[in-house]
């Protein structure tokens, strides 16, 4: 194997701004790009507030979300930053994971303190597995009383602790996004301080290739004289020829086999890794032993399950979703990775029904096992049409 070439590139981290409406998320996003552009002109372009605020609409799994993507660099890192103009866009983005976050900047206005959407975003961040939070206490220039600033900071820390973030330990940085954007030197420095806190407190994510091997099966073929080949895109990890793998999901029994060949673009490889579309030749496996929807994994790294809890967003009628609400015992299909499995929905106590456009927690019982872990995303479908999207928050069985 040729040695991997050494690339002088910075670590890449995905972050986003979350928090209550009008607390200054978009202004802060613009201020970060401006301040970093001023500090490191050759590394950064400044993005104006209007550019970010007029976020283009994206469609992810049939769901329309407005997301602004900006990128910038500190001395040590390269960041991709997402900001959503509307509250509904945040909810949709966080649940569908359209833009996955390695960490978030929670923006809280010092003039208001934590508000209902602050709570909702923190709860969602906890449920969908945003692992780290740094707080920007914004509009700090508008509060003269030190005691009030300290009280608001305490409130934010308590809120974060309530949702199992390390509220006492994580950084809370006082900033004024607007003043920084207007070129005020002192408040410009506050935004640099914030980014230093982000650099130091949001760890680099584990790269997909370093995780245990997993590939969802998309297709199965028989090649005469050679055996059974399954194709798919490697989701994570690295697989070498002659390694042992488990095939799990859909069926009750797992199958263990050896991969005797790995092909990509009709060429034989020594190994396949995350992101590559490959064909795997499996020893002693018949065509009917495996099917689309199963996954091939490093033995023992994932287990199949039928019962889980999830946070889901249900498409509105305008997004092509349902026109009517659904109730307890709703039975749609849950599309995991490459296949649909029917499941029965139990709504949280006190929730009679779920309207199109709502987000909700739910318990689901599938009729066939699916290889799953917390954080796994799925679409909710009715006869092939997407009516919702969600993420596994807890596995029950």
Curated annotation (Swiss-Prot):
It comes from the Bacteria. Mg(2+) binds at residue 26. Residues 19-26 are annotated as: G1. One of its GO terms (molecular function) is GTPase activity. Residues 83-86 are annotated as: G3. It is found in: Cytoplasm. The modification Phosphothreonine is found at residue 386. Residues 62-66 are annotated as: G2. Residues 138-141 are annotated as: G4. HAMAP family: EF_Tu_B (MF_00118_B). Belongs to the TRAFAC class translation factor GTPase superfamily. Classic translation factor GTPase family. EF-Tu/EF-1A subfamily. PANTHER family: ELONGATION FACTOR TU, MITOCHONDRIAL, ELONGATION FACTOR TU-RELATED. This is Elongation factor Tu-1. It comes from Streptomyces collinus. The lineage of its organism: Bacteria, Bacillati, Actinomycetota, Actinomycetes, Kitasatosporales.
């Amino acid at each position: 194997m040729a040695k991997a070439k050494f690339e002088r590139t910075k670590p890449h981290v995905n972050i986003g701004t979350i928090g209550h409406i009008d607390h200054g998320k978009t202004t802060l996003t613009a201020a970060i790009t401006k301040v970093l552009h001023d500090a490191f002109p050759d590394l950064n372009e400044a993005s104006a507030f209007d550019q970010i605020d007029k976020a283009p609409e994206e469609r992810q799994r049939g769901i329309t979300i407005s997301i602004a993507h900006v990128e910038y660099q500190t001395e040590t890192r390269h960041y991709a930053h997402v900001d959503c103009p509307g509250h509904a866009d945040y909810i949709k983005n966080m649940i569908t994971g359209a833009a996955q976050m390695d960490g978030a900047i929670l923006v809280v206005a010092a003039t208001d303190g934590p508000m209902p959407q602050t709570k909702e975003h923190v709860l969602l961040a906890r449920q969908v597995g945003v692992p780290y939070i740094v707080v920007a206490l914004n509009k700090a220039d508008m509060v003269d009383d030190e005691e009030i600033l300290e009280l608001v900071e305490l409130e934010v820390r308590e809120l974060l602790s309530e949702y199992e973030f390390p509220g006492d330990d994580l950084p809370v940085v006082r900033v004024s996004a607007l003043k920084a954007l207007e070129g005020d030197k002192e408040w410009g420095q506050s935004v640099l301080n914030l980014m230093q806190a982000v650099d130091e407190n949001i760890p680099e994510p584990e790269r997909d290739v370093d995780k245990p091997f997993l590939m969802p099966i998309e297709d199965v073929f028989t090649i005469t004289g050679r055996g059974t080949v399954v194709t798919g895109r490697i989701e994570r990890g690295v697989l070498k020829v002659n390694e042992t793998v488990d095939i799990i999901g859909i069926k009750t029994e797992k199958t263990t086999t050896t991969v005797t060949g790995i092909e990509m673009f009709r060429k034989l490889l020594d190994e396949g890794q995350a992101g590559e579309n490959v064909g795997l030749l499996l020893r002693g496996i018949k065509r009917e032993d495996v099917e689309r929807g199963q996954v091939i994994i490093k033995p023992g790294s994932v287990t199949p399950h039928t019962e889980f809890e999830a946070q889901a967003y249900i498409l509105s009628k305008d997004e092509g979703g349902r026109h009517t609400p659904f109730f307890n015992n709703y039975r749609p299909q849950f599309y995991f990775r490459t296949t649909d499995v029917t499941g029965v929905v139990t709504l949280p106590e006190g929730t009679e029904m779920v309207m199109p456009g709502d987000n909700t927690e739910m318990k689901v019982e599938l009729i066939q096992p699916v290889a799953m872990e917390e954080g796994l995303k799925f679409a909710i479908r009715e006869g092939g049409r997407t009516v919702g999207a969600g993420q596994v928050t807890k596995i029950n069985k």
